[in-house]
Amino acid sequence: MLDVKRNLTTMTDFYELTMSAGYLDEGYKDKIAVFDMFFRKVPDGGGYAIMAGLEQFINAVDSLEFTEEDINYLRSTGAFNEQFLDYLRNFKLHCNIWAIEEGMPIFPQEPIVTVEGPAIECQLLETLLLVTFNHQCLIATKANRIVRSAAGRPVMEFGARRAQGYDAAYFGARASYIGGCGSTSCVMAARDFGIPASGTMAHSWVQMFPTEYDAFKKYAEMYPDACVLLVDTYNVLRHGVPDAIKVFDEVLKPMGKRPKGIRIDSGDIAYLSKKARKMLDEAGYPDCTICASNSLDEYIVRDLILQGARVDSFGIGENMITAKSDPVFGGVYKLAAVREDDGSYTPKMKLSESAEKMTIPCLKKVWRIYDQDGKAMADLITMADEVVETQHGITLFDPIETWKECTYVNCTARCLSTPIYENGKRVYSSPSLDDIKKFCKAQVNTLWDEVKRFENPHRYYVDLSQKLWDTRSALLKKLSK
């Protein structure tokens, strides 16, 4: 079981430790900082991403502890003094952490996780936080694209063997399920996360027997209630489908059973599925489904459907489990504010030649604005102490092209920044994975179809409150001098 409370404390970049040692030496042990995780672009040029990975991050945070083995290793590097090693030995989390809940559509620039606490603690969480959310957000986003392309047809996650390591296969299956997949081929993920397991046979099963018919016959005898036959080992139309029909007639029919389906894993799937459908129907098996696999992605799935392919479900492997077409999520973790001794916050931001790469300072919240029909219209980032009131409507403006304004009436605002930890104590109860999946589907349905386009989606606006925009503008002017 990989999803247990394992100690991942040293799953960090070395410079997190060297910086932390410097903070301690400078007297910054209790200096309160605010960091945000956000991302700058949606993978595959999409209109939105899917939040995923919070449960695994929580499990890792709950298990933070520097063991004596860790301390001894760090001592052996020669980079750290005993004062810092003693600090690590007695390490305890005191941070406040907010996050957008799993399954929620998320957008560039908005903080999807915010950490407030002693600077050393914030720094030591960075790598662990990024590796967790960057992976699962990436895979959940890709899975959601593929599931939407299937237009209601079931999508099965088949990617374990092509994943980049055990954790990637295991947690990738979880993220794929959040994104909308109906099952996984990964037995460990199915067992631990309660995801339905799926899978029947490989070509090696067919090749192991004297004939394809013999292989099909044995499988049908063993699994009469779940008989799905792989029909492309030799020739789909000359041998595979005819042999499958023969086994259905000779083995399943006498038992009073019906076949579940056939799977096509190669060739021109649009053409083969049409021919196979005709053969199955004529043989009296209109209820026998056809599953397609073979390096599919959202574009191929969409094209198959547009071409009239008679495919009832899809098995997706490497293109989903690795997000092969755009395999880096690109989430970053940046300092947003530092709390002074008097309790006030000094905003911090990173400058850039590109406006899109300049960070947003201050301790903040993210709000989603919905119209009277429940459709998401825009997101609004505010200072943490602001409350968004919508009784009399709300006017939002583009933070870069400020002359672009839009006023929404009869709308509601939902705060997305959910408390996860308060002073190091967990205050959030995680929903079940099935509930996260349902939540994801419901929230994606609040987006306009134009935002969900695969090519050239409408840009969903993420705006700043007037107070936050003014603060950022003043800081930008000050830092640019």
Label every PLM stretch briefly:
Residues 1-33, 41-43, 79, 85-94, ...:
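Buried, small/hydrophobic-residue-enriched core segments of structured protein domains
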Residues 1-31, 40, 44-46, 281-283, ...:
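Gly/Ser/Thr/Ala-enriched C-terminal appendages of enzymes
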Residues 26, 33-89:
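N-terminal, Lys/Arg-enriched amphipathic/low-complexity engagement segments
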Residues 59-64, 99-102, 106:
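An N-terminal, globular interaction/scaffold subdomain
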Residues 77-85, 165, 392-400:
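Short, positively charged
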Residues 97-103, 413-416:
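Short acidic, Pro/Gly- and aromatic-enriched capping/linker segments at domain boundaries
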Residues 199, 291, 312-315:
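Short hydrophobic alpha-helical runs that function as membrane-insertion/retention elements
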